[in-house]
Amino acid sequence: MDVCSKNSNRTAPVSEGGIRRADVPLCSRTNGWSWPPHPFQFLAWLLYLYFAVTGFGVFVPLLPTHWIPAGYICTGITFVCHLFMHLMAVSIDPADYNVRAKSYKGPMPVFDRTKHAHVIENCHCYLCEVDVGPKSKHCSACNKCVASFDHHCRWLNNCVGSRNYWLFLNSVISALLGIVLVVVIASYVFIEFFLDPSKLRSDKHFQQVRNESVVWFVFLPVAPVTTAGPAIPALAGVTIALGLLSALLLGHLLCFHIYLMWNRLSTYEYIVRQRHRQEAGDSRKPPPENDSGVPKLNLIKQQVSYSGTLGYTNPEMEVEDPKAMTSQEGAARYGNGRIRCSSEHMDEEEHLPSVLTEQKASPHPHKHAQKKKRKVRKLAAEVNGDISIDTSTAKGLQKTSAEKESSVAAATVSSSLGQRLPFPAFPLRASLPPLAPVQAAGPPAEYHSDSAESLEEIPVAMARLGSAALAGAQIPTTTATASSSYSSMLQCALPSSAAGHAAPSPQPRTKRKTAARTVSEQRFEMLYHNPSMFMTRESGEPAIPPEESPRAAKRKQTGKKRNTEDAKPSSRVGTSLA
């Protein structure tokens, strides 16, 4: 067995510790009859002889008389076919055509991997020293290139290629059929031996010993040999066990090659593909946990408060860690360990939508209800130049970053599921308003109405809807001029009683509560205000109070209207109803 364990036909370089015998030539094997034989080859021959002897010599002669010819013919054909196919598959040289054309009876060189990475490169074998086909492979067991290499069969002790593949496949099919027939006959003999032994004693030799039922004959009818009765079921049981095991293995091999033919693969290609899949599966497995405490940052999270999908993931994206943000012990950091300075924090708060600012500024629910009733829409705007960078704080944070790096890293690992993105994946579609004052497009068309009862019903020049500017910005000159022109037209159109003072609105006026305005609300608001002007009786000209806010002017105008109403009767008293 030591001869079979050592493969002298090796293609790999000999190790430094190994001793290479100079008198042993490294020759190529021609076919399955070349030395040395494989143990599986001997086992295949022994199994073939066993099933042939037991089938034709013991079980088929014990069959009923009318079944004996069918048993010999069917079983004999399968065994003969298998023997022919097996011998042909073993005897054929499956080498490549150029290898067979060249005499390879001499010793083969040992492959040196320091010169070439592979034995066959660009369809040239550096061991056989010939050009081979694209599907030819150099078999290390046979030490030669095999045309359309499939696999090296140890039962045949020969390579299986394009020249002997169908012979190999037919030998498998014939062996499977022959073993199945032998198992069926042995099972019948085993069962009838216990049920009705007389059906197995139909031969003329059993008629001579009719009274002695314990005597049985084997190898009938040519060379009858007397044996004991229990030997027949014992031999049948062993044959059934070996036959079932052999049929299972041969059936699995046949199904495997049918699968390969269906997918147009060879055994070698299938093994290589499975190896690649196994390596790919091992690479997908998560690596072992790192004990050094380096934080593992997961940039993609499923629970994100914005809508849309990320087209790609930028590995340099800064993601905030909530535990690092809310930590009271250390400085505020990003999830990747970088320190967040105060200026960056303020910029992020300004770039957030105004809805988030309203939620932070108004924690009470009744203030939210008042804002919904007002229906004031606000848009986010960038304000440049009103934020000062605290350099001393940034330097202090950078000094403490090295001391608390390990604690923040551990918190980042434990809170990977709670990370959030401080900005949406896509920018807002609303365009940012310009920082310059908004000018009116032009004076509107002349307004004519006989039902105008107050100045609030007369349109004034306003900015377009959707424009935004800083709160407290001065009204442009063009807007003031347009307002004065409106008042002059009103003075000509309205009667003298209405020009003196403004009539009260028919709708009841409710006093609105002035809620506390936050800094963010004062910073951004729409330019939707009534013009701060009032009418005087003496001059009849519109006057704009200097340096007064819109709300103060409105309160002053409302108070004056009420005083006038108390002093004089309403202008609507003497009006006749139509």
UniProtKB/Swiss-Prot annotation:
Keywords: Acyltransferase, Endoplasmic reticulum, Endosome, Golgi apparatus, Lipoprotein, Membrane, Palmitate, Transferase, Transmembrane, Transmembrane helix. GO terms for cellular component: endoplasmic reticulum; endoplasmic reticulum membrane; endosome membrane; Golgi apparatus. It comes from the Eukaryota. It is found in: Endosome membrane; Endoplasmic reticulum membrane; Golgi apparatus. It is a multi-pass membrane protein. One of its GO terms (biological process) is positive regulation of NLRP3 inflammasome complex assembly. It catalyses: L-cysteinyl-[protein] + hexadecanoyl-CoA = S-hexadecanoyl-L-cysteinyl-[protein] + CoA. It holds the Pfam family DHHC. Residues 278-288 have a biased composition (Basic and acidic residues). The keyword Oxidoreductase does not apply. Residues 278-298, 345-376, 497-517, 532-578 are annotated as: Disordered. Residues 121-173 form the DHHC domain. Residues 363-376, 552-561 have a biased composition (Basic residues). The active site is at 153 (s-palmitoyl cysteine intermediate). Residues 63-71, 196-230 are lumenal. The chain crosses the membrane at residues 42-62, 72-92, 175-195, 231-251. Residues 1-41, 93-174, 252-578 are cytoplasmic. Palmitoyltransferase that catalyzes the addition of palmitate onto various protein substrates, such as ncdn and nlrp3. Belongs to the DHHC palmitoyltransferase family. PANTHER family: PALMITOYLTRANSFERASE ZDHHC1, ZINC FINGER DHHC DOMAIN CONTAINING PROTEIN. This is Palmitoyltransferase ZDHHC1. It comes from Danio rerio (Zebrafish). The gene is zdhhc1.
